[in-house]
Structure formats: structure tokens, C-alpha cells
Amino acid sequence: MTSSRKLVYIQGDRDVEVTHPDVTLGDILKMECADRKILPGIKTIRILRFRSRGTRRCVLSVLRIIEAVHEKYPDVEIRNLGEPDIIVTYEDQR
């Protein structure tokens, strides 16, 4: 039996710091997939946008990450090997 679904493994740490306001999945996750053609597209999916200057924090659920991937790639199966929630901290470098 063959499946048309592609399997992507994701791993996120509990705390992640970013230095730019537009946050993509590639900024906050480690990813692995046997089909290397879809990884670049998944890494560029924007998941957050910080609008204020200074330090800001946001808690991001892995379910929101899976939802964002499925919007663009509905046939991709996601397996989370990391934290269920990720705290993303934006540190404005200006």
C-alpha cells in the first residue's frame, strides 16, 4: 500500500529568539523530510509578525504550525518531535 502523503518531522525548542519581525517556520524549527523538494517551501511559511519595537514574546502552539503547513501543503503529514508550545521572543536589533 502506498500513500500520497509526505511525512515531515519538526522539532522546536521551548524558547526561540528571533531578530526580525517576520518569523517563518525555518526561523523557529528544525525540519526533516525524505522529499527534499517540499522543505524549502515549508521553511518560508510565515507564522508570526511582530509589530512593535523592543522585546516581545508570543507563545506558539504546534497545532497552529501544523495548520499553517496544511494550508499550503494539505497532503503533508507532520510529526512533532519537540515542544508542544514554543515561546518566540523578538529582540529588535535597531
Which residues does each PLM region occupy?
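N-terminal, intrinsically disordered, low-complexity segments
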Residues: 1-73
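Extended, hydrophilic extramembrane loops/domains of integral membrane proteins
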Residues: 59-93
